[in-house]
């Protein structure tokens, strides 16, 4: 929500915690069908038995190993974070032309698609997912 507000974008959060951010089309793309970018905000963390991290409270400390970003003793936890990062990067970029965007960020995906199930998709207007 803070990201959207800082970028002057329309946003709302539903009772479940899902977030919808809307961005207008860039010049020249106003008549193109809108596009939905979607990702989920939750993740499942896993760790080795000897890893001291409390995955509910502690930060994961990434390391670069052989050119790959990894985490010691735990999963990196990227999961669908890449979809969220991609969507926010597109919204932030000044050099990526696009039609009107609706960024849908859902919660509780890992425990049964609860966020997506609670979302009112009839409010979305984009032509493509």
Name these PLM-found stretches:
Residues 29-100, 105, 110, 117-120, ...:
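Active-site metal-coordination/substrate-binding segment of hydrolases
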Residues 7, 22-24, 90, 115-119:
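A generic local structural motif
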Residues 1-33:
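A non-catalytic alpha/beta surface segment that caps or lines the substrate-entry region
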Residues 2-5, 17-20, 84-87, 110-114:
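Short amphipathic alpha-helical surface micro-motifs
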Residues 129:
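Phosphate/diphosphate-binding glycine-rich loops and adjacent basic-rich segments that engage nucleotide
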């Amino acid at each position: 929500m803070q990201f959207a507000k800082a970028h002057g974008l329309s946003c709302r959060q539903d009772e479940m915690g899902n977030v919808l951010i809307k961005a207008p089309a860039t010049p020249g793309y106003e008549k193109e069908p809108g596009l939905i970018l979607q990702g989920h905000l939750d993740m499942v963390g896993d760790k080795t038995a000897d890893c001291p991290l409390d995955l509910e409270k502690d930060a994961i400390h990434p390391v670069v190993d052989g050119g790959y970003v990894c985490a010691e003793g735990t999963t990196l936890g990227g999961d669908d974070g890449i979809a969220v990062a991609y969507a926010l990067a597109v919204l932030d970029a000044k050099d990526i032309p696009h039609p009107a965007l609706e960024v849908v960020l859902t919660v509780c995906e890992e425990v049964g698609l609860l966020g997506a199930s609670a979302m009112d998709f009839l409010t979305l207007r984009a032509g493509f997912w």
